[in-house]
Amino acid sequence: MHKLLVLSLVLLGGCTHGPQPTDISGLWINQAAIDSASQGRPLLRAIDAHGLNLEWSIDTRSNKAQVSNAFELGEGQLQPKAPGAWTVDYNGHGTDELQLDDNQLIQQATKNHAAQRFTRPAQPAVAHAQWGMTFRRALNSAYMGGQWKIIEGQGAGNIVVFNADGSVSGLAQNNRYELCLGGDCATQGAGNDTLYLGKGDVGDSWIFVRYGKQLEILQAINQSQPDEIPQLTPGPRKWLLEKQ
């Protein structure tokens, strides 16, 4: 009788401590694209190699899912499909399939796109941040972070610091920068990596070339007519920076 009582307690304990439903609420970013770019590779190639989407924002309580890439935000209804699997329905305009694999959120492959893997950001998201900014801040930190020395160009010998929030110091009068991650700026750059440099609301687009620890910043020459979409081509080099 004593053995039967012990066995019953063990079975009851097992029933009360079963696996809890997994909550995937929160932000997930395309860390694979960041890791690839941070090895010193051309930025757009690194992003293209790891999928179109850059960030997922999920709220399981309201059954909403938002996905962002470099130029648009999509929002759909999150529908549980099976344990650890969900469907995102974009109001009848297509679906995405999501699956949790350990600590990664997988966006399943479709006939047009390869599968993508997303992870939780290492740094917490900034409150009320614009869509896509968590990915962008993580990319800025990994790809542009640290100290850069001006080897050639205005301010030679100066140290330049690109911050995660898009601010920059030591690069002439510029105090803001923004990397082009795709969309119109990528089309205008005709395959070249581009970034915006400016002070306040005044600035210009530049073409940059990244090879390992060296970063060339070139003038972007617009070959289009004033009433046409800009088509930028590399011009003279303005700066050569080297990561310290």
PLM region spans:
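Sec-dependent N-terminal signal peptides
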Residues: 4-13
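Residue-level detector of conserved, well-ordered beta-strand and adjacent loop positions
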Residues: 29, 119, 149, 163, ...
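Surface-exposed interaction/gating patches
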Residues: 133, 137-169
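Contiguous, well-ordered beta-strand patches that form the walls/edges
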Residues: 33-42, 48-104, 152-158, 168-243
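Short, structured interface segments
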Residues: 105-137
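N-terminal helix-cap/turn-to-beta initiation motif at the start of protein domains
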Residues: 15-29, 128-147
